[in-house]
Regions:
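A structural preference for long, well-packed, hydrophobic secondary-structure segments
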Residues: 142, 358-386, 417-427
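Amphipathic alpha-helical segments at domain termini/boundaries
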Residues: 1-36, 188-342, 470-476
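Conserved catalytic cores of soluble enzyme domains
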Residues: 117-249, 396, 400-476
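N-terminal short beta-loop-beta anion/metal-coordinating cradle
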Residues: 51-68, 333-349
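Structural beta-sheet core signal
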Residues: 111, 149-151, 355, 390, ...
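A short, well-ordered alpha-helical element
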Residues: 58, 86-106, 338-342, 365-385
């Protein structure tokens, strides 16, 4: 272990600071004890094998220290190394930190997130690493230890780490921070510039930026781009835990359903703000953080107000007939399919098994994530202890400007939390990959299971080749 008593200078930009400088500015001076620092030289074996640059800390600083005198554990991602992407070693350091938290029980865990998501050069090793981080965050919360996410770095927080952020108890963002699932470059490369113009910076920040995420309810605090402001936010949010419970997730589900009902038809952040009742939404982007909080508070509360919404965002669907499912349940099943999403149950030798999942390469958007979470929560509520089979055949998250505008990463984080609640309540969860299993289509469901199995021909992968080529700058 390495001790470092350095401190961040006053009024230091969070966005421009390095990962280590952010962490040192967050924690009390002289209390930081870093684990597996650069001197340990724990590096990615995959990058070395590919002849790519390595970092001696693999792009993440993990440490323990004190925050206003209280013991905390913290991790800070380095966006300057491979865009803060998470590979096998990077992910293992985060998982180890979260497991240590459950053992030593600090005041909480603070994650300084600056990441483009899965390290594409490590492919499925990175995908599995992110799924393990997601599960570790939820297990730490379930153990009664709050996890706070801070998003204000230059790379934002995207991909699987965008879901990880929404698995935290609470999030603080700056205006400059960005949070989402599919980044603007990925959406443009996959769906075209007509769907989302990644070069339109104003549009990108209206869609992903801290101001929109604050009104939407995806961020709990909006702060200035200042290390000290993020430190104060961490102190405040550690005192506002959201335990993983049936009541907490039921309320979160109602809020997400109300958001979809109210803002589902909006095409731009200004439209969302207008629907929420914000006065002069066009001028909100021009305000500083303090003025924005004052002007947008009413809209934030209005958008978060619970209301009467449809319980079935996809409809009831129709009976699902599939030889593979018939073979799994020769005694019969009542599984129904709607827009490629499966819900129902099957009769096994040991009793009834709940079934949720995807079929036919379905893309998972906000409606699908909400429907899957509703089914998992219904099983927990109505059928205590019933085993849960998560079937996955999905080309991943639906890549659209609308889904990112609504915060699809938050809907998928909610689904992951619902699966974790089922596990905590004694439901055995088994994931079965039957076809494509891509990114957001597998992370919050299949990879959250107690056991994950794959049928012959199943194809877990990270991202479409054109988008990977654009992000990595490596020709497809």
């Amino acid at each position: 272990m390495i001790r470092d008593a350095a401190t961040a200078p006053p009024r230091a930009s969070f966005r421009e600071a390095t990962a280590r400088r952010r962490l040192l500015g967050l924690l009390d001076p002289g209390t930081v004890v870093e684990a597996l620092g650069p001197a340990e030289r724990v590096t990615s074996p995959h990058l070395a094998a590919l002849g790519l640059p390595i970092a001696f800390d693999d792009g993440v600083v993990v440490a323990e220290g004190r925050l206003e005198g209280a013991p905390v554990l913290a991790a800070s991602g380095e966006g300057g190394f491979m865009g803060g992407s998470v590979g096998e070693v990077h992910g293992a350091k985060l998982v180890g930190l979260l497991r240590r938290a459950r053992r030593v029980r600090p005041r909480g865990v603070v994650l300084l997130l600056d990441s483009g998501g899965v390290r594409l050069q490590e492919a499925n090793a990175g995908l599995v690493a992110v799924s393990e981080v997601m599960r570790a965050v939820l297990e730490t919360r379930a153990a009664g230890i709050p996890v706070v996410g801070l998003v204000g770095g230059g790379w934002g927080c995207f991909g699987g780490m965008g879901i990880v952020a929404r698995c935290c108890d609470t999030i603080a963002m700056s205006e400059e921070g960005r949070l989402g699932l599919s980044g603007p470059d990925v959406v443009e490369a996959t769906k075209g510039v007509e769907e989302l113009d990644a070069s339109d910076r104003a549009l990108v920040w209206r869609t992903y930026g801290g101001k929109h995420r604050f009104i939407l309810g995806e961020a709990d605090l909006l702060v200035d781009d200042d290390v000290a402001a993020f430190r104060a936010a961490a102190v405040e949010l550690l005192g506002r835990p959201r335990p993983i419970s049936e009541a907490t997730l039921a309320r979160e589900h109602a809020l997400l359903a109300a958001r979809l009902a109210r803002a589902g038809g909006c095409a731009d952040a200004a439209d969302v703000w207008r629907v929420a009742g914000a006065a002069e939404p066009e001028r909100l982007p021009l305000l500083d953080a303090a003025a924005f909080r004052a002007a947008a508070g009413g809209a934030r509360r209005a958008l978060a107000a619970e209301g009467a919404v449809a319980e079935e965002p996809l409809g009831a669907g129709s009976a699902y007939r599939d030889p593979g499912l018939d073979a799994l349940f020769p005694r019969g099943h009542t599984v129904r399919e709607a827009a490629g999403i499966l819900r129902g149950s099957g009769r096994a030798e040991g009793g009834e098994v709940a079934v949720v999942g995807s079929a036919g390469g379905a893309e998972v958007g906000v409606e699908a994530a909400l429907a899957l979470a509703a089914e998992v929560l219904r099983v927990v509520r109505e059928h205590p202890g019933r085993p849960l089979l998560a079937l996955v055949d999905s080309r991943g998250q639906r890549m659209s400007r609308r889904d990112e505008l609504l915060g699809v990463n938050g809907y998928l984080g909610h689904l992951a939390a619902a699966v974790e609640l089922a596990r905590q309540r004694g439901h055995r969860v088994v994931g079965l990959l039957r076809g494509d299993a891509v990114s957001g289509g597998v992370l919050p469901l299949g990879f959250m299971a107690d056991d994950v199995d794959a049928l012959e021909g199943a194809n877990p992968w990270v991202m479409a080749l054109p988008a990977m080529a654009r992000v990595t700058k490596i020709p497809a």
